Amino acid sequence: MALSEEPAAGAAEDPVEDPVEDAGEDAALACGAALESFGESAETRELLGHLPAVLADRSAREGALERFRVIMDKYQEQPHLLDPHLEWMLNLLLEFVQNKTSPADLVHLAFKFLYIISKVRGYKTFLRLFPHEVADVQPVLDMFTNQNPKDHETWETRYMLLLWLSVTCLIPFDFSRLDGNLSQPGQERASTMDRILQVAESYLVVSDKARDAAAVLVSKFVTRPDVKQKKMASFLDWSLCTLARSSFQTIEGVIAMDGTLQALAQIFKHGKREDCLPYAATVLQCLDSCRLPDSNQTLLRKLGVKLVQRLGLTFLKPQVAKWRYQRGCRSLAESLQHSIQNPREPVTQAETPDSDGQDDVPEEVESVIEQLLVGLKDKDTIVRWSAAKGIGRMAGRLPKELADDVTGSVLDCFSFQETDSAWHGGCLALAELGRRGLLLPSRLSDVVPVILRALTYEEKRGACSVGSNVRDAACYVCWAFARAYEPQELKPFVAAISSALVIATVFDRDVNCRRAASAAFQENVGRQGTFPHGIDILTTADYFAVGNRSNCFLVISMFIAGFPEYTQPMIEHLVTMKVGHWDGTIRELSAKALRNLAQRAPEHTAREVFPRLLSMTQSPDLHTRHGAVLACAEVARSLHTLATQQGRPVSDFLDEKAMHGLKQIHQQLYDRQLYRGLGGELMRQAVCILIENVALSKMPFRGDAVIDGWQWLINDTLKNLHLISSHSRQHIKEAAVSALAALCSEYHAQEPGEAEAAAQEELVKLYLAELQSPEEMTRCGCALALGALPAFFLKGRLRQVLAGLRAVTHISPKDVSFAEARRDALKAISRICQTVGVRAEGPPDEAVCRENVSQIYCTLLDCLKDYTTDSRGDVGAWVREAAMTSLMDLTLLLGRNQPELIEAPLCQQLMCCLAQQASEKIDRFRAHAARVFLALLHADSPAIPHVPARPELERLFPRAAVASVNWGAPSQAFPRMARLLGLPAYRYHVLLGLAVSVGGLTESTVRYSTQGLFEYMKEIQNDPAALEDFGGTLLQVFEDNLLNDRVSVPLLKTLDQMLANGCFDIFTAQENHPFCVKLLALCKEEIKKSKDVQKLRSSIAVFCGLVQFPGDVRRKVLLQLFLLLCHPFPVIRKNTASQVYEMVLTYDVVPTAVLDEVMAVLSSTAWDAELPVVRAQRNRLCDLLGVPRPQLVPKPAVR
């Protein structure tokens, strides 16, 4: 039974949250099903027609089946589009099935295709098209003789045959007429009726899907008029015996019980009441003895509930309760006609007395209803859903008084002693009763308060909570009530329901619940027409708008709060339910939402809400305490802002008691030692946010003792960041730094623009001292604290502060891994520059000026060379990223105010370093460097002076063209950055960056960086001067980075690529060209005494490439290779021999006379053998090629 038959009923049991609620799902829903017809008709016809041709080829057979499955799956949501085509598809496939000459494999394949069609369209619709004449019964039945129930490859055949047989069972003739004479001598055989029943019973206990089809067959067959008289009793007896001897604790028992329960449920559904009633009590008794509620098999419990409710319906006469509440008619025409004739007359329940006496209700009904009520509390949704439907169906046949008792029992599910499963089941049951008109208006006064509680139901369980399914189902109840009742019936509850639905729409944690509430609100607006401002709200809070949680809390809530009916309920909900929520994100959003809503109801917030929040700050519950402090901070700030806008003092909203309460928060937490431990982390962050907001609100606390307490908290937090858990460290650090900036600006100023001398001395001295702390996190916090100080606090101390921060950026052996400290020091330097501003001739102790600007630039540019790595990877990248950002901010600041301070050499170094970073291998940092580079190039207010080759850069990177470039994508970044190789000012640095990328490990980076480099090399192949310049630059990069493995190893790989691709072929015309001579010398120096296998392998490839250059250099290269043939590492010897062999094949460097012998030595020698053996073969190669034999150098004697 599908769970999606009604909105919101199939809510997930476990709380599922989608914090990153992106637009992917929304887009899919917005597009909807766009299909208009079965577009693959011709392809399908051809596919089905060629089944005999693909039968022999397993690959082709599986391909055809998969293709058909893909085609059909497209129509899962619009299966009706297949209806005009079902008949010809069925006929095509049945031709193979009914053809006596068809191979068994073809028959099985045809049934696989038939199953796929039935799965998509649904077997009830598809089966009608199967042939079901009298002549079809025996052939279908005979097909079962060839079936093996244990063959797991052909279960689709058995499934479809059972369904086909269930259709043929509907023929309107007695089966005995098909039997002929069963008792002829020597020809005794079973009757058709017995054969069908035997097939059905045998397949009810198999483990595959044929079991489901067998249950359908039984229900159609046993309920036939001729069969029920002879076989129903015996089949029910067999079923009850099967249930009795089966145990749900074994797999075989579960399978047998599943099939039997399905069959019984189908029989009591399709059979006539008078036929089933004599057996109902016995079946119920047997079912009770099976104790299915104790099973851990969800499906068995669901089938048990389904069977119980159908037994209950069998006990009761099939009648429509005259007492039920009705709104409108099922027929739209009748409903419209009635509304025209009686526009104001509501349709209510019949006034006639209930003619059904309680004596007509059998005593078994009580047991049935009791079991259904237990099913409402089951741990699985599908069981609760089935039980809820059963409750609704049963109540519809009960007398009014008994049905009201059932309603009362359902309401008992909503006590706080019950689990979330009971609440969910109760909601589903109430919805079923309401939509069937069985929940009379007189009961609404009891039901509505329960539903309002269910709309906010949430229980903490472990690290998360349960209840999202309850809230979802409660929305379903509201949706059902909107359709079930006339507006005047719900009018007394409109205010409460509308407020509750609005609250769920904007403030529920779960996106599914927000959307369900939005749908329920929309249904009520449309059906009831009495919800205040309904149209305005539902157009703003629609299905897609409520998909984003932050948007709901901060934007939509503000709009809805503009309607006074909803303002106070929303504020009340936030204070009561969300400020102390277990999810920290919800607490933070709730505090911000309260800040917004306080603007809508300032008097109520100040008079009622703020005192409650203050009392909650001392709660023993950590989450409540944390959320309350955050809320106090945000509300106080909001009320101050409002008072300022209205030209009133903040004391008009916050009286002296409230002010005192704000001041007492820190001291009370400190006295209770609540700043310690994991809970203390939350409270430190919250109080820091409180300090910031109170300071920004300019509360009159200057000179108060609380300021010292707040300052202690900030200092203690920054000094002990290393004791805070890593996942919350960043948030606490940011909160403390922001609090310090606000506190100093407001409460440490003696008068505007002048700091308290004692506070300035104490804080600056403290933070500068802590910059040398052995704890990295302490350095981070204090560096950022210095960066956050206001300008008047740095007055007279700027030189000292910058010197301290500069010292943090220097790498020493003891703090080489302190990359985060260096990053935060750079951020602090940048922020200080923005704070103090620029004055070209100003004092260096007060502003950025001519005297200190070059030193600041040197500090930042030096940090671009930070390539520190540790177990976390390239941590120096954090430093380089911060340095690039700081350089951009500083340069733009100088460009706006004092462009003359930007000197040409400095600007050239800056732009070249950025170009290098924009050519390197890490996507994220390459993209950041490119953005900074282009921001400086295209700055126009005014333009940055002295940018090297500005006209060429603007031509290569036009503003409009590069705006859409994804610099993080290697395919887009490297081809553009490689163009800078043509500009001499940038060539060195770009080549340095590209060399690292071309010789890297990431496939996409290597491919596109190589492609960009080779494109440039191709352009200069016919320009010897340009090639000479490029070669000189390349050698300079190599020379400057000798023994620097970060650059030299990838550079060797880059050189190998370039030599192998003929980038320097023009140099081969000259013997002993300076380029190759110097390159050989550099390579020898790089691998001298090296034990790095990767470096040695890369150098071998370069040596092999250098062989192409004629002259004395070739002999030296061969000598170097022959030295490596006797390297101590066997892997290097083997690798050298392999590459030399390829080199001999590639380049014509070996005389023809000795070529075969050289290749034979290289290929036949075991180069990983003992060194004396290898050395002899190496010397032989030296003799053949005329290269002097290397001589062993004796080790100096040890004295």
Curated annotation (Swiss-Prot):
Pfam families xrefs: ARM_TBCD (PF23579), TFCD_C (PF12612)
UniProt-listed InterPro entries: ARM-like, ARM-type_fold, TBCD, Tubulin_specific_chaperoneD_C
Biased composition (Acidic residues): 14-23
Molecular function GO terms recorded: beta-tubulin binding; GTPase activator activity
HEAT repeat boundaries on the chain: 368-406, 603-639, 757-793, 1111-1147
GO cellular component: adherens junction; bicellular tight junction; centrosome; cytosol; lateral plasma membrane
Protein's GO biological process: adherens junction assembly; bicellular tight junction assembly; cell morphogenesis involved in neuron differentiation; microtubule cytoskeleton organization; mitotic cell cycle; negative regulation of cell-substrate adhesion; negative regulation of microtubule polymerization; post-chaperonin tubulin folding pathway
Chain intervals for the UniProt region annotation (Disordered): 1-23, 337-361
The entry's keywords: Cell junction, Cell membrane, Chaperone, Cytoplasm, Cytoskeleton, GTPase activation, Membrane, Repeat, Tight junction
Location(s) in or outside the cell: Cell junction, Tight junction; Lateral cell membrane; Cytoplasm; Cell junction, Adherens junction
Subunit structure comment from the entry: Found in a complex with at least ARL2, PPP2CB, PPP2R1A, PPP2R2A, PPP2R5E and TBCD. Interacts with PPP2CB. Part of a supercomplex made of cofactors A to E. Cofactors A and D function by capturing and stabilizing tubulin in a quasi-native conformation. Cofactor E binds to the cofactor D-tubulin complex; interaction with cofactor C then causes the release of tubulin polypeptides that are committed to the native state. Interacts with ARL2; interaction is enhanced with the GDP-bound form of ARL2. Does not interact with ARL3, ARL4A and ARL4D. Interacts with beta tubulin. Interacts with TBCE.
Record's function text: Tubulin-folding protein implicated in the first step of the tubulin folding pathway and required for tubulin complex assembly. Involved in the regulation of microtubule polymerization or depolymerization, it modulates microtubule dynamics by capturing GTP-bound beta-tubulin (TUBB). Its ability to interact with beta tubulin is regulated via its interaction with ARL2. Acts as a GTPase-activating protein (GAP) for ARL2. Induces microtubule disruption in absence of ARL2. Increases degradation of beta tubulin, when overexpressed in polarized cells.
Entry's family note: Belongs to the TBCD family.
Protein name: Tubulin-specific chaperone D
Species of provenance: Bos taurus (Bovine)
